[in-house]
């Protein structure tokens, strides 16, 4: 009689070894891919220096705004000034991207003042030396969150790791609420106008601050790329007209007088700007 053989255990051991080898082979590409992530990011940053600098500056805006709300590592005045400086640097880089070489001509100046980035740089210059206020920081913060999220998603796609699902989920929420974020920014810019007047009367800002900010609002209202300021003014007008219809005659007259005053201050849109 033949002795029993040990073939089944050997086959199980061979299968175990083969499965271990296959798992090791699968882990090797993942490890090499994770090791290539810093190199990919570094190459991307070197190739897209301006866009990467804009992304970093927007992250600084978010960080210093949080530092303003929670002044643990720095004072509120310092955090406020750094947000304004970072916003001015962002606007300067965007103007460098969008405008040709400087030329002292009427066409160049007209194109310069039509750019949204020029408006945001003017915004930083207006409020750089005033008393710090969270209301002034909100428009800068919302713009930075919106644009930094978009570029962060591009970096996550470049890395190609699914482990960052939490960041992708937050970015998807921001992009889904992009219209509401731009709308909230427009309303904040409008509400800052009476706030600037109050600051001037309380000697917390210069007397020319409301005047200069009015010209800023005029440029935002005439923006060709961002219709949200015009839409915000239209919504406020509808709201106050409805409020005047429900108010007593004396209050209704005051409200309608304010609506007429704001309408007279509104600029006349050019046909090209209205179409865009």
Curated annotation (Swiss-Prot):
Q: Which residues carry this modification: Phosphoserine?
A: 22
Primary location class: membrane
Protein name, UniProt field: Krueppel homolog 2
Give the location in the cell. Membrane
What is the membrane topology here? Multi-pass membrane protein
According to the record, the segments passing through the membrane are: 53-73, 125-145, 181-201
| Keywords noted in UniProt | Membrane, Phosphoprotein, Transmembrane, Transmembrane helix
Name of the encoding gene: Kr-h2
Similarity remark: Belongs to the PER33/POM33 family.
- Gene Ontology BP, a term: membrane organization
Which lineage? Answer: Eukaryota, Metazoa, Ecdysozoa, Arthropoda, Hexapoda
Here the segments flagged for biased composition (Low complexity) are: 18-35
User: Record's Gene Ontology CC terms?
Assistant: endomembrane system; endoplasmic reticulum; membrane
Annotated spans, Disordered? 1-37
What is the purpose of this protein? Member of the dosage-dependent hierarchy effective upon white gene expression.
Tagged with keyword Metal-binding? no
